[in-house]
Amino acid sequence: MLNVTTTPLQKPIDATNTGNSLQRQIIVILDFGSQYSELIARRIRETEVYSEVISYRTSAEQLRQLNPSGIILSGGPSSVYDDYAPACDPEIWNLGIPVLGVCYGMQLMVKQLGGTVERAKHAEYGKASIFIDDPTDLLTNVEEGSTMWMSHGDSCVHLPEGFEILAHTDNTPCAAIAHHGRQLYGVQFHPEVVHSQDGMALIRNFVYHICKCEPTWTTEAFVEEAIREIRARVGDQRVLLALSGGVDSSTLAFLLHQAIGDQLTCMFIDQGFMRKGEPERLVEIFDEQFHIPVAYINARDRFIDKLKGVTDPEEKRRLIGHEFIAVFEEESKRLGPFDYLAQGTLYPDVIESADTNVDPKTGERVAVKIKSHHNVGGLPEDLRFKLVEPLRKLFKDEVRKVAASIGLPEEIIRRHPFPGPGLAIRIIGEVTAERLNILRDADWVVRDEIKKQGVYSDFWQAFAVLLPIRSVGVMGDKRTYAHPVVLRMITSEDGMTADWARPPYELLETISNRMVNEVKGVNRVVYDITSKPPGTIEWE
């Protein structure tokens, strides 16, 4: 495994440890296992206030030291009466810090403070209209009858002393509650999800009016502080970055270059599975437009040789990853030595891969595991790097905002997500030079046409997949026996779930006509109408 420093978040490039205005206000989310915990943090940040997801096990004393402006208790899959139901430190209620419990978080608040939670007579899942009993404070500017997203089987039936009902639904008497004197609030619905009509109004009320936060978490402030922190951490040492061409690594390269200049070396390994024209365009943008030198490594023949005869998708991924490591090792030694490895780790990676619990012995928050970038995971032990991860506190949409603010071109900022193994896993079956050329040309038709028609940004992803079969066709009064191509176009907010796109038939027709006429070896185009779930975005 990659030998990196994993001390308790020691001087990471993040806004919570900088000692400036970015860290003075933070709202923390205690995570009880909700699928929406990350989304709550994103919604808070949309108000330009910093937010982090941390473990529900964090003690009241540790929260006191962190000194957040507010605390949110997430939802979760458990019932508060389950034998092993997760519970927070009950001293949290006595900190004098505003608390908002969401769904399970509200039920836990009620139970710990002496109220009663029972299995609901009528479980609520989906949209429900709320009727407001007290329009002040938390529910200011939330409309009567507003639609909110419900997902609960338990309900609060008796409130603790001092609490009052703020809103109800047809099936839930306590849809929103408050103890105004102690600034404790709860909602049975999920204001963070897009289906909740006035959810953001409620969140803004909690952030601005109840927690008294100011909008200081801005793109400009982050860029300024990130550059300062990179300089402070790296000093005069050298940094290596494996550039992929995506928005994350490109933004990271720009920030690092602004901070340390020629101490940065960007390495781009061309494994031969990129989209048409992308390797050349990447080097052109960085070399000519931004004057950031890129060490271009042409390893196409090595990678395709490794995949001869391989059809299993997991074996493809393994071999590509292994060969990338081999090339990376050789080239880093040739270009080095380096002290730091820069990675485009984002906040969702931190949430997924690092336990943000506190160490029971030291009281410090410890990263138990660092999730390596798909390109550099499993590097040999003798490559000893310290990590620098300036983007580790950002969500994807925040990275795009940073990229725009520092002047990266739209073609990078709005670039559709692309898998690490590239076109190799969009070719079902064996990868050959011939099949790569077919798919690369077919994929180019898709991208070129949606850009021409001005709808590129309407899709989360739009691409072609080459199947390991042939189909009969007729072209020029002659029988053909050629490849069918699958057209995959999807919409999504974050890639976690996705829906198949409903583009105009005229667009589908144009793409199909262009493919069979312009791409040698293709005589049929089919459209994938599978959402995620049950399918995945990629075919392999």
Curated annotation (Swiss-Prot):
One of its GO terms (molecular function) is ATP binding. Residues 26-216 form the Glutamine amidotransferase type-1 domain. It is an enzyme of class 6 (ligase). ATP binds at S244, G245, G246, V247, D248, S249, S250. Keywords: ATP-binding, Glutamine amidotransferase, GMP biosynthesis, Ligase, Nucleotide-binding, Purine biosynthesis. Its EC number is 6.3.5.2. InterPro entries: Class_I_gatase-like (IPR029062), GATASE (IPR017926), GMP_synth_C (IPR001674), GMP_synth_GATase (IPR004739), GMP_synthase (IPR022955), GMPS_ATP_PPase_dom (IPR025777), Rossmann-like_a/b/a_fold (IPR014729). Homodimer. HAMAP family: GMP_synthase. Catalyzes the synthesis of GMP from XMP. This is GMP synthase [glutamine-hydrolyzing]. The gene is guaA.
